[in-house]
UniProtKB/Swiss-Prot annotation:
The protein's role, per its UniProt record: Component of the cytochrome b6-f complex, which mediates electron transfer between photosystem II (PSII) and photosystem I (PSI), cyclic electron flow around PSI, and state transitions.
Assembly information from the UniProt record: The 4 large subunits of the cytochrome b6-f complex are cytochrome b6, subunit IV (17 kDa polypeptide, petD), cytochrome f and the Rieske protein, while the 4 small subunits are PetG, PetL, PetM and PetN. The complex functions as a dimer.
GO MF entries: electron transfer activity; heme binding; iron ion binding
Species this chain originates from: Lobularia maritima (Sweet alyssum)
Annotated compartments: Plastid, Chloroplast thylakoid membrane
Keyword Glycosyltransferase: no
First and last residue of the signal peptide: 1-35
Name of the protein this chain belongs to: Cytochrome f
Length: 320
């Protein structure tokens, strides 16, 4: 009987521990989800909508610039650099999930043409490896090797992210052709404002959910506020919860309207997207162009020599 009770107690403890770990995981995931492009993997099959909008913008509401640099043309089965630039003021600090201020991280999603993919380590030159640093890239999906994600990574070190890309070879991949292709990029700096479930993070403005008089502002022990709003017309009370890390714009006794901002906007980051074009060049076409240019140069040389020879003949005839 005692053994049975012991096993029952052990089973309950294991179940309780698993439940606690699961809750910690859910809370932690909720606090960071949708903060960087890499988390879009968990919610969207494709990061680029039919309208051309990259889904990271659903959670990063502020618009910021992003730029991409790629070669104008590449040869098949060669490795090239795609450099994504995510500029921002390095002196800025953002509100973290715990309410404290910290440095901004960055992330990016790179949408390549079908057939283009992350270059294998043995094809990357030492010079390119030095530019890449300690970055670790991932495929957006196992079956989508042409879509790469990175982040979050420290923005002060990686405001420029170098992707090593392997160009496809139409000789071995019949779905690839020698054409001009588009490349799309999305990049963000800082945390998002909206979580995937639609709830707000503590990196955005909180507005009043009702109009009336602010009856009470309670500062919570672990940070944040409870703001009690009383509707003067019907004495109905509404409590708005403000998470930690935000600065209040209102005070007790103040009259406010529906949707009036209760806090300042703490967001200093944002998301941007851009595009570029790259040509997968046929080596035979390049050779043909070089042959043509060589022929033109030779023709010009022969023309000059012929002209000089003609001038010499004319000069000798005049002397004769």
């Amino acid at each position: 009987m005692q053994t049975r009770n012991t096993f029952s107690w052990i089973r309950e403890e294991i179940t309780r521990s698993i439940s606690v770990l699961l809750m910690i995981y859910i809370i932690t995931w909720a606090s960071i989800s949708s903060a960087y492009p890499i988390f879009a993997q968990q919610n969207y099959e494709n990061p680029r909508e039919a309208t051309g909008r990259i889904v990271c913008a659903n959670c990063h509401l502020a618009s910021k610039p992003v730029d991409i640099e790629v070669p104008q043309a590449v040869l098949p089965d060669t490795v090239f650099e795609a450099v994504v630039k995510i500029p921002y003021d390095m002196q800025l600090k953002q509100v973290l999930a715990n309410g404290k201020k910290g440095a901004l991280n960055v992330g990016a999603v790179l949408i390549l043409p079908e057939g283009f993919e992350l270059a294998p380590p043995d094809r990357i030159s030492p010079e390119m490896k030095e530019k890449i640093g300690n970055l670790s890239f991932q495929n957006y999906r196992p079956n989508k090797k042409n879509i790469l994600v990175i982040g979050p990574v420290p923005g002060q070190k990686y405001s420029e992210i170098t992707f090593p890309i392997l160009a496809p070879d139409p000789a071995t991949n019949k779905d690839v052709h020698f054409l001009k292709y588009p490349i799309y990029v999305g990049g963000n700096r800082g945390r998002g404002q909206i979580y995937p479930d639609g709830s707000k993070s503590n990196n955005t403005v909180y507005n009043a959910t009702a109009g009336g008089i602010i009856n009470k502002i309670l500062r919570k022990e672990k940070g944040g506020y409870e703001i009690t709003i009383v509707d003067a017309s019907n004495e109905r009370q509404v409590i708005d919860i403000i998470p930690r890390g935000l600065e209040l714009l209102v005070s007790e006794g103040e009259s406010i309207k529906l949707d009036q901002p209760l806090t300042s906007n703490p967001n200093v980051g944002g998301f941007g997207q851009g595009d570029a074009e790259i040509v997968l060049q046929d080596p035979l076409r390049v050779q043909g162009l070089l042959f043509f240019l060589g022929s033109v140069v030779l023709a010009q040389i022969f023309l000059v020599l012929k002209k000089k020879q003609f001038e010499k003949v004319q000069l000798s005839e005049m002397n004769f």
